[in-house]
């Protein structure tokens, strides 16, 4: 059980959050339709509270929690004694206590296990969407419940508590802005905004309207500062115009909404002609702005003043003379009067301590952080003015998750995506990159389309390896539905839950999509020079445009040549591109190269060794076989497999060089074969920067290649014999190479890779 919880803690918490609106709907239907006063919500959230306490104490064994939990228990005991001595209706008062202290207990517990889970903003957004949907549909169909029992107009859909639902929608409004800000899909964005506006305007309550305008105001401030700082006046103007259009639209439809009707009704009740007359009298301000909360505050203050000293210290509870007292609906005062000086101290000492720990390490580096801080401000402000935020379990849970979005975990979370781990250059390079990450600083996840391949067992043991399959079902509709479901599931639970994500397999659409969902700090790895893969600009652009490469933060190339070719077509993306070549494990290469193999080379022949995938679309291995045919002093070993192995074997027979060309197939350890070589040969039409170059340099082997490439540190022309792709020219050059000096040079690859690892860490930490 504990192992299961540890593995799925993020998903379990996320499911609780997503189920919350459904549970609240069941509660609303029970109370309003069947007159059954059974609150599913309370039971559901108490189960979650117990689960979180259990997990923090017994699964993750957080001993730091023993002291604050003891403080809570001691206070609860003194509070219960006070209720027994001076009050009545013990059960109702205990129920009130649980509701109020739900927030600090959940906050405390989740904060101390924050390093073990990550909740997606999309999870919160999904919960908000369900709340909006369960109000919007009944409102349109005219079958929902009324927000107010008398006088005022408003519809609450299938929910029961207007204050709590308003609070949830209000504090999640900035989270909705984050999702909309990032979304590239216009139609869903417009539909969501319209549904949101209809709901908050037809509910009839003030709180969501205030939250909307507050969020818009903060957004405008952010856009102004960003636009002026970056001198990007065009985008600034477009953004502000969009907000003005939104505000203008709200102004047009406002007179037809329940919110506006309620303002008119309230003014008529008070005998006023306009809103400005409200501010002429304190009583009117209290009635219109605070909904008489200040009057309730005075009444509760009188009860508190008359209470015994014990209750002043530990709280007067929630009943008086056998009847439930009216809450002030200003959370800070409700906590103080209901739980006394000691209860208030315990609640806020722990809450403010954790909040301070979180805020001292946060920054305002981007719009998302601005919006999360906006949600935090709304939680603080609305708790004071409207209540039902930190004293209502349904809103408390959402509030805690929002605040925890600001926390920093001990380790940054990195995600790499790939096709599979079958033997290949890209796959080996990915393994080596994972081996060069500092796991004291980073928690790394590798998601594969197919969790298979000979290299799977070589993945660093610290890496979490997962599989998200791409359906290839013959039924196109079923295939699309399955893939859409898997993408949606990933989006809901893992949207922006990583600090860095990298699409390592350039050609994979699935990897491309998952990478962009997982983080806002994204990278796209380009391992080949696609100028040679595609014959013209249109096809080249189609490849990169279909992957929406401009949406990435970083575009990483393994060679300068492939980077420059890319910039020839996309000069506007210059600030995004950089060159960072692949990693190799030099110690492993040298050690494994010493392993004994049965293969022996032909006496008095120069040995050429090729290592790679046998795919004629790029490798053009016939050139190497032709060299052996024309130059009798050469033999060729071919290490690898692929779709064109049969073609190459047939060509070998046609050239009658079977005695000097040997196909070894895939070798998990190719290095003993490379160690026996005189030359490592590559005769490709195109490559990025082949890992084989680095392996050959490590083994002090001469290189013969058709690819004169360079990376962030090495220009291969200084280390290799460059030959022509034209076979006639190539054969002449090969003949000359035989009589040349060895061209290999020693280079400290380990030193280079340490510098390269630092550059990667800079990307991870952005």
Task: Please give the residue ranges for each predicted region.
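Alpha-helical transmembrane segments of multi-pass inner-membrane proteins
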Residues: 121-146, 160-225
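Long extracytoplasmic/lumenal interhelical loops at the membrane interface
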Residues: 156, 284-339
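Transmembrane alpha-helices of multi-pass inner-membrane enzymes
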Residues: 371-380, 388-410
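N-terminal signal-anchor transmembrane segment
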Residues: 1-58, 75-86, 138, 381
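Aromatic "clamp/platform" in nucleotide-sugar-dependent glycosyltransferases that forms part
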Residues: 666, 685
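Hydrophobic transmembrane alpha-helices and their immediate junctions
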Residues: 186, 225-228, 232-233, 338-380
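Aromatic-anchored transmembrane helix interface
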Residues: 45-48, 69-80, 89-112, 122
């Amino acid at each position: 059980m504990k192992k299961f919880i540890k593995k799925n803690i993020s998903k379990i918490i996320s499911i609780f959050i997503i189920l919350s609106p459904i549970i609240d709907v069941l509660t609303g239907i029970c109370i309003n339709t069947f007159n059954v006063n059974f609150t599913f919500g309370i039971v559901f959230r108490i189960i979650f509270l117990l689960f979180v306490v259990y997990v923090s104490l017994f699964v993750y064994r957080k001993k730091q929690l023993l002291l604050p939990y003891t403080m809570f228990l001691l206070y609860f005991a003194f509070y219960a004694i006070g209720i027994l001595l001076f009050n009545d209706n013990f059960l109702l008062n205990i129920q009130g206590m649980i509701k109020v202290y739900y927030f600090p207990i959940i906050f405390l517990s989740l904060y101390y296990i924050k390093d073990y889970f990550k909740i997606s903003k999309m999870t919160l957004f999904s919960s908000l969407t369900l709340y909006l949907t369960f109000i919007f549909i009944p409102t349109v169909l005219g079958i929902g419940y009324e927000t107010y029992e008398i006088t005022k107009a408003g519809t609450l859909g299938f929910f029961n508590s207007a204050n709590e639902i308003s609070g949830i929608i209000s504090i999640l409004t900035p989270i909705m802005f984050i999702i909309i800000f990032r979304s590239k899909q216009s139609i869903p964005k417009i539909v969501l905004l319209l549904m949101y506006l209809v709901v908050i305007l037809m509910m009839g309550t003030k709180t969501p309207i205030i939250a909307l305008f507050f969020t818009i105001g903060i957004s405008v401030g952010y856009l102004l500062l960003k636009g002026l700082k970056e001198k990007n006046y065009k985008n600034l103007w477009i953004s502000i115009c969009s907000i003005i259009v939104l505000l203008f639209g709200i102004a047009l439809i406002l007179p037809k909404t329940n919110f506006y009707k309620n303002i008119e009704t309230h003014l008529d009740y008070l005998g006023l002609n306009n809103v400005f007359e409200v501010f002429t009298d304190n009583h009117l301000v209290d009635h219109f702005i605070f909904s008489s909360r200040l009057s309730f505050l005075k009444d509760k203050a009188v009860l508190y003043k008359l209470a015994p000293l014990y209750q002043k210290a530990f709280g007067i509870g929630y009943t008086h003379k056998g009847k439930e007292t009216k809450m002030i609906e200003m959370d800070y005062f409700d906590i103080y009067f209901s739980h006394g000086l000691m209860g208030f101290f315990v609640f806020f000492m722990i809450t403010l301590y954790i909040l301070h720990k979180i805020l001292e390490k946060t920054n305002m580096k981007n719009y998302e952080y601005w919006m999360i801080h906006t949600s935090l401000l709304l939680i603080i402000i609305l708790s004071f003015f409207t209540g039902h935020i930190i004293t209502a379990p349904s809103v408390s849970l959402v509030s805690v998750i929002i605040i925890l979005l600001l926390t920093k975990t001990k380790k940054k979370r990195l995600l790499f995506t790939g096709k599979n781990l079958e033997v290949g250059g890209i796959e080996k390079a990915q393994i080596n990159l994972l081996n060069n990450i500092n796991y004291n600083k980073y928690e790394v996840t590798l998601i594969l389309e197919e969790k298979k391949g000979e290299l799977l067992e070589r993945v660093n043991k610290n890496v979490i390896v997962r599989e998200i399959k791409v359906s290839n079902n013959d039924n196109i509709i079923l295939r699309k539905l399955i893939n859409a479901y898997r993408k949606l599931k990933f989006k809901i639970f893992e949207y922006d839950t990583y600090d860095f994500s990298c699409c390592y397999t350039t050609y994979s659409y699935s990897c491309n999509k998952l990478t962009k969902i997982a983080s806002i700090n994204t990278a796209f790895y380009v391992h080949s020079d696609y100028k040679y893969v595609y014959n013209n600009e249109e096809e080249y652009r189609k490849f990169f445009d279909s992957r929406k490469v401009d949406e990435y933060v970083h575009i990483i190339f393994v060679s300068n040549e492939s980077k420059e070719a890319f910039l020839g077509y996309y000069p506007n993306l210059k600030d995004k591109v950089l060159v960072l070549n692949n990693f190799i494990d030099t110690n492993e290469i040298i050690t494994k190269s010493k392993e004994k193999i049965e293969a022996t080379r032909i006496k008095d022949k120069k040995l050429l060794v090729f290592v790679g995938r046998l795919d004629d679309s790029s490798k053009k291995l016939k050139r190497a076989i032709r060299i052996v045919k024309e130059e009798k002093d050469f033999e060729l070993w071919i290490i690898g497999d692929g779709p064109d192995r049969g073609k190459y074997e047939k060509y070998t027979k046609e050239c009658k060089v079977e005695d000097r060309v040997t196909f070894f197939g895939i070798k998990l350890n190719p290095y003993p074969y490379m160690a026996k070589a005189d030359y490592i040969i590559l005769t490709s039409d195109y490559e990025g920067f082949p890992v084989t170059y680095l392996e050959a340099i490590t083994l002090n082997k001469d290189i013969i290649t058709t690819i004169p490439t360079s990376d962030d540190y090495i220009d291969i022309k200084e280390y290799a014999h460059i030959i022509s792709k034209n076979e006639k020219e190539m054969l002449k050059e090969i003949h000359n190479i035989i009589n040349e000096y060895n061209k290999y040079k020693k280079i400290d690859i380990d030193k280079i890779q340490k510098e390269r690892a630092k550059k990667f860490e800079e990307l991870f930490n952005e």
